[in-house]
């Protein structure tokens, strides 16, 4: 039985995996072209998928640029920080530009009150919760500024997790990577 490419596209779209799956299709075409000849993707679907993959690539370039700019801005204001989750995780992909980007999560060193005050000095009405505060959308990219990278609902486990973050923060705040082609 052949691959139902439309079904794969629908699944990949729902799971935010269009870019990654398109990378696989490109590899399939290079490494096993006879498979694609036996079970071809329709031209219209292929063009749609290719277009989505390019949109994902461009969005990654934009989010990388915003993350780098935000990181530099916070450092200039004397705040140590690191990018969490999304764009940092993308570096683990064979092609970081194939991951569908979302918002930027950035961990800023310091007490929650200090970080909240800093963000509210820029945008007074931002909402804060236990582990992060919203930051004004920057060039169309949503940003969350974390004073705690994450949390657990069980207070005993959460205390242990926060102690762990305290132990590793020096390593995290001093780690540098390149996002994109900067």
Where are these regions (language model features)?
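Conserved NTP-donor binding/palm subdomain of two-metal-ion nucleotidyltransferases/polymerases, i.e.
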Residues: 1-102, 107-182
């Amino acid at each position: 039985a052949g691959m139902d490419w439309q079904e794969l596209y629908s699944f990949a779209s729902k799971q935010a995996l269009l870019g990654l799956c398109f990378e696989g299709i490109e590899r399939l075409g290079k490494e096993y072209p006879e498979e694609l000849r036996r079970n071809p993707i329709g031209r219209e679907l292929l063009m749609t998928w290719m277009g989505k993959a390019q949109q994902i690539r461009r969005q990654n370039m934009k989010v990388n640029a915003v993350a780098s700019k935000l990181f530099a801005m916070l450092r200039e204001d004397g705040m140590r920080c690191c990018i969490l989750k999304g764009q940092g995780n993308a570096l683990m992909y064979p092609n970081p530009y194939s991951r569908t980007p979302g918002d930027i999560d950035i961990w800023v060193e310091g007490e929650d009150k200090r970080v909240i005050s800093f963000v509210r000095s820029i945008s007074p009405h931002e909402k804060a919760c236990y582990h992060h505060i919203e930051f004004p959308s920057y060039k169309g990219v949503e940003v969350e500024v974390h004073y705690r990278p994450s949390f657990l609902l069980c207070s005993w486990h959460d205390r242990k997790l926060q102690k762990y973050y305290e132990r590793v923060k020096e390593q995290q705040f001093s780690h540098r990577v390149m996002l994109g082609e900067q």
